[in-house]
Amino acid sequence: MKTNLFLVLINKEFTEQWRSSRLIILLAVFLFFGIVSPLTAKFMPDIISSMVKGQNITIQIPEATWKDAIGQFVKNISQMGVFIIILLSMGTVAREKENGTASFLLVKPVSRNLFILSKFLSQFILLFVSMAVGFLTVVLYTKIFFGTFSMILFAKISLILFIYLVVVQSITIFFSILMKTQIPAGILAFMTMLLLGLVSILGKTGVYSPSHLIEESQIIINDAAINWQPFAGSLIVIICCISFGIRFFRNWES
């Protein structure tokens, strides 16, 4: 019975994401960066050279490689992608509080735990599908422009980036549960990500910050060994957001 109800809630989330165009927007974002990143890596040296041409300025720009395309994709997603994910996720629960959908559903025999779990899981699945689209697009265009390409290496980098974005989503959904409206939830999520970035520069404690995952993806590009601490820190953040999110929502009075 609970399994069937959970699947119904998941289906409701997917339907809502489609109707609200959140699914299309996130897919479009990853598709866009999947195309633009290899293009930027390939043609940026030529653009810079043409800009300084005739100005008696000499700039030595190394020839772009497929690693530059991957690095550009990671940079784009970890900056603009994070901002867009926060915007799309900040209303996950807060929006339904505002329009009364949450109150309507909870009048029925719907478990609050399953309600929140369906929110987290559906968002994670949406992110995974979007990442897959971005991954395949980068692979295609990098193959076209650079020829050689390490699929396994990029898969590892994409997995690290996915974990980082799951952290972003988890924090945003947590504040969406905590807050009454969307805007404060988004602001708090953004401030928390900034705080995690500041924590990452601290000594022994900072190495556990999820913000270090972006650095780990760059380390993998250069074929160096990665550190496990940011992964442990990310797992703790995700579990805490889900656990405390469920706990707070149990006490929410519709």
Feature map (PLM): residue ranges:
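Short hydrophobic, aromatic-rich alpha-helical segments embedded in or entering the lipid bilayer
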Residues: 5-8, 204-222
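Transmembrane helix-loop junction
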Residues: 16, 95, 108, 139-143, ...
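Juxtamembrane non-transmembrane "cap" segments at the membrane-aqueous interface
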Residues: 47-53, 192-212
